[in-house]
């Protein structure tokens, strides 16, 4: 067995394409689908607080709208500083209503009006919780705008006051402060770490209890997502350690919104590197995460697939933790899911398993997933085909001879060769790399493989790639032609024809790693 492993390790060195090694074979999400990198759900992107009808105060809608439209910003600013509590509250409320409008709220106009310091001062008015609530709401909506608008709120020294309001005896004030802090934290790693440094985590987590209203808990969970977001740099290790026990509780919640946000938080943490992946594993949450791959809600499935997909970009040992939770049993349904994005992410996951060790490659084969990958290589949308090409190519690097022979038996060559004409140079290179590996591994059977490549039109495509503008591609195409399709080949010698086995197929040279049933392709 040790000799076989040495041979396989040597083969890895010989067959890997330039720049392809075990580290780069496992591909993180940002290399795979750039547009999905942030993948903020709609409500995350639109950080603005929508205005429920019940939150519009005593005035009738008509009266309130009339007052807002007919009150100049100058008057609002002036009245917001009034000593008369009624006038002051109405002015702050008018500002909040302007900011709550669905169509182009005048955030910049309000910032320029000089109202920010006044609103921030209102946060200190413990004697007037209604004023605190309205001011916090207005500031929340200003912070929901552009990064510059969020920074304006931060620079007005609002954050320490929002943190103070987390201890308010009035729940609506607490909840509004949570929402405001979520918008500020979501602006980026600098704001996130600033708010963390002021001590947001403990009071935030203290809200998680059976008695908390569901809408409030949704807000708290959403802020936790923002705390876990961003990986340049990732959140402080101490913060992750504080948050993980709460995520271990929330992953059992029955509310779909809370569950989705909990799993997205895990996906962001596992996207930050192997150290963070290990922290998530050590929390014991993975056995509760994997079953969510078959959750009835697509939103939950999508988030879970991303989270486990990030974990298997880690080491073989970290990958094995996911496989030990019977993860592969969920993939027949994911590979045939009506949503193409789920197909694509599922194949991306599997491409990182086939980049693993030979036992992990065998697990994919034993789960009968290879024919499904090949089907998507042939019939999937281009994004999914690209992932399938990686999955196949990685298997030709990581797999044993019999495992690669199984690929051939499943008729991988025609759909693999079809991708040689796509415009994406990376895909072409991945396919050429895989074909080269297969041909080298075939040894005495290389001619048989060559015939399969030629019969499906692959040889003609490889010949054309010798003129490709990409240097790596034309060199690899030339090497394949030179080594395996040279016109100097001797005439076919009957004694060299591979022996036919049952079913009219052929066997690889049986000098190493021969399973009892023999090689077949």
Curated annotation (Swiss-Prot):
Residues 306-394 are annotated as: NLS binding site (minor). It is found in: Cytoplasm; Nucleus. InterPro entries: ARM-like, ARM-type_fold, Arm_3, Armadillo, Importin-a_IBB, Importin-a_IBB_sf, Importin_alpha. One of its GO terms (biological process) is gene expression. Pfam families: Arm, Arm_3, IBB. Residues 137-229 are annotated as: NLS binding site (major). GO terms for molecular function: nuclear import signal receptor activity; nuclear localization sequence binding. Keywords: Acetylation, Cytoplasm, Host-virus interaction, Nucleus, Phosphoprotein, Protein transport, Repeat, Transport. GO terms for cellular component: cytoplasm; cytosol; male germ cell nucleus; NLS-dependent protein nuclear import complex; nuclear membrane; nuclear pore; nucleoplasm; nucleus. The modification N-acetylalanine is found at residue 2. Residues 2-58 form the IBB domain. Highly expressed in testis, ovary, small intestine, heart, skeletal muscle, lung and pancreas, but barely detectable in kidney, thymus, colon and peripheral blood leukocytes. A motif (Nuclear localization signal) lies at residues 43-52. ARM repeats lie at residues 66-106, 107-149, 150-194, 195-233, 234-278, 279-318, 319-360, 361-400, 401-443, 447-485. The modification Phosphoserine is found at residue 60. Forms a complex with importin subunit beta-1 (KPNB1). Interacts with SNAI1. Interacts with TALDO1 isoform 1. Interacts with CYB1. Consists of an N-terminal hydrophilic region, a hydrophobic central region composed of 10 repeats, and a short hydrophilic C-terminus. The N-terminal hydrophilic region contains the importin beta binding domain (IBB domain), which is sufficient for binding importin beta and essential for nuclear protein import. Functions in nuclear protein import as an adapter protein for nuclear receptor KPNB1. Binds specifically and directly to substrates containing either a simple or bipartite NLS motif. Docking of the importin/substrate complex to the nuclear pore complex (NPC) is mediated by KPNB1 through binding to nucleoporin FxFG repeats and the complex is subsequently translocated through the pore by an energy requiring, Ran-dependent mechanism. PANTHER family: IMPORTIN ALPHA (PTHR23316). Belongs to the importin alpha family. This is Importin subunit alpha-3. It comes from Homo sapiens.
